[in-house]
């Protein structure tokens, strides 16, 4: 068996991927915040001055506000999708490497099954924890 969660926590590649994903998320959050600030600024201007504006100006600003709301909503959806794509891009190679190494350890040691230990409620004394073997294969 192997506790994959424990293994992942120990991998420098995962720490690096976590860091890159956090940076990416922070960049997205900054862009989102700038859109919201722009909207709030224009809305405040509209609320404070609309009574003195011409109908054409008021309608123009209302259209701008509506477009900004749509842009904010679209960006939020797109950023969630982009974040998920980035996460897969960063973690899939790591997970594929782990799978390959698990297979290698299994074949080398003639194991018929390797279970994920993070979900096991009981492990008998005959069970083999392959964590040391995996760490060696992954260079941890």
Model-found features: residue ranges?
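Amphipathic, charged alpha-helical segments and their helix-to-coil junctions
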Residues: 1-140
